[in-house]
Amino acid sequence: MSELLLELFSEEIPAFMQKNAEEAYLNIFTKIFKENEIFAQVQVFVGPRRITLHATNLPKVILPKEEEIKGPSIEAPEIAINGFCKVHNVNKFDLSTKLINKKLYYFFVKKTQAREMKEILPKIIIDAINKYSWIKSMFWGCYKIKWIRPLRNILCIFDGEILPLQFGHLSANNITYGHRLTNNKKLEIIDFENYRNKLLENNVILERLKREEIIKVGLLELANAQNLNIKQDARLIEEVTGLNEFPVVLLGKIPQKFLELPEEVIISVMRKHQKYFCLFDKTGNFAPYFLFVINGRFVNIELILQGNEKVLSARLADALYFYKHDIAKTLESRFSKLESVIFHAKLGSLKEKVDRITDICRYIAPDNIDLIMAARLCKSDLVSDMVGEFPDLQGIMGYYYAKHEGLNEEVAKAIRDHYKPQGLNDNVPSGNATLLALADKLDSLVGLIIVGETPNGSGDPYALRRQALGIIRIIIENKLEINFINLINFAVSLYKVPTNTHLDSVISFFEERAKFYFKNDYDIALINAVLDLNLVDTKFKLDTLKEFLVQDVGKQLLNAYKRVSNIIGNQKITGLVDVSLFSTQYEKELFEVIQIISQQIIAIIANKDYKKALNLLSSLLKPITSFFDNVLVNDSDPKIAQNRLSLLHNTCEVFDKVVKFCRL
């Protein structure tokens, strides 16, 4: 069996795209080989400058074969028979017939010729390369092909020989290149083993997972040597793995003078800008060291270390300057500057947004002075030098500036945490930040829906779906008992637009997001049966109903309801039940039970004891069963028949006072 080696050698491939490309090309080549009846073992490797395919177990020749293709019956219209012949490029007289289920059908035996693998591989490879669509791709020079970055070379060897492959202006050869900085020379390749070994000799580790493991081990060893802990950061490890062909981990030191900066600032500078790893002591305190990964083995490691420390010091010096400049002013003094920052072209400035947030907070908790103060100051750090340079520190810098000027911890924490939760894996805020986060997200969502920015399809440029889920999580996880519809109504009113029109749009949007939130844990029918915008209550109802309906009594009660509901169907039942028209004891018994429990259920629901309410409904089981066993609803007397339908209608209404059984 034969071996194929393909390398697409390019300029630097963005690190965050490499893993997806590796997985995609593995699937693409595996699939396209199978489609061509080539059952090979396929591996794909990706690195900063190359994507490599290694396929083994390839036959030198694909053997000829015969395939019997069924056509139309001999009784089919002539046009259908001629169409079959045209598709398969065959004469009608060359067709054979077979009897299938007492009916004759035309058949055609398709024969394929033997094909040499080296003749069919070029087209297969080009098709596979073109099948993957990068998130972004580019043209370069005057060439007509496009790729993620300019392709510089294609290596393609089949059974030790160069495969005649042409991709755009590039012709395949047997050449690759070593490490860009330390061993950037041409390497002639014979086969895959020779390829991997020569790359390693020239400071290139082919396997992404091997590079990743080297980085993980190096980080851990250097951290342990200093008796420090490294914060796990899978995304950063993946990124530096994609930046380095031959990773080497080093330890650097942070000058003491920069430790007066908040640790979040130092971490942001190191992680986001320098791709460095942070270290902490055994008690969790930030340590004045950092770990970083260099690309290759170099003689003068000390010079590289000094260079990285110097670059980090320069960035931290800028951050320290921004910090000292910022703390010279109060958050309140920055408030007026928000007037010059646009929140949205149709919704005014950030100052106007802050005014609305403050009004919402005052509406929710009019006596909470700390909350109202935090609301007024929550966006002031956005016009600070530090947040201007490091946007990911919004809220965090507001916390430190608030603490520096002597504001209390509750105000500072609310400013810091009011952006939470930022995604499904983030915690919801607590304390005053709970209501401030709710107000901020609600104002954004209401305003953007009013001006027509409601998400369509997969597009959601303002992350309104995420903001709605954030609001839902804040309410449920903090068990906030608020009248949410009234709150939405108030938030809409702050925009001085017709309330009713936009209120319905906002409520509808929230209901859809609530369904999305609950659907992971509950059946959609249960959600539809209980959903309203009292979200804490909805969650409690769902838990209670889910538990009840798996019990025998719950199943029996649901079946009883459906039996009653099916009799009524789509008929519009009007009129009260007339007890004088009862002709059986079973009608009377059902009516009496309904009368008794109907009033009781109202009181029980008011106390939110849904389990008790469902158990009370189960007292209807016996009279409903007796009614259907002994009473014919469609009596010959239309008045009696109508009265019995009214009785069943009342029965359904009692059920629906607890939950909407009609949606189950």
UniProtKB/Swiss-Prot annotation:
GO terms for biological process: arginyl-tRNA aminoacylation; glycyl-tRNA aminoacylation. Its EC number is 6.1.1.14. GO terms for molecular function: arginine-tRNA ligase activity; ATP binding; glycine-tRNA ligase activity. It catalyses: tRNA(Gly) + glycine + ATP = glycyl-tRNA(Gly) + AMP + diphosphate. It is an enzyme of class 6 (ligase). The keyword Flavoprotein does not apply. One of its GO terms (cellular component) is cytosol. Disulfide bonds: none annotated. It is found in: Cytoplasm. It holds the Pfam family DALR_1. It comes from the Bacteria. Keywords: Aminoacyl-tRNA synthetase, ATP-binding, Cytoplasm, Ligase, Nucleotide-binding, Protein biosynthesis. The keyword Aminoacyl-tRNA synthetase applies. Tetramer of two alpha and two beta subunits. Belongs to the class-II aminoacyl-tRNA synthetase family. This is Glycine--tRNA ligase beta subunit.
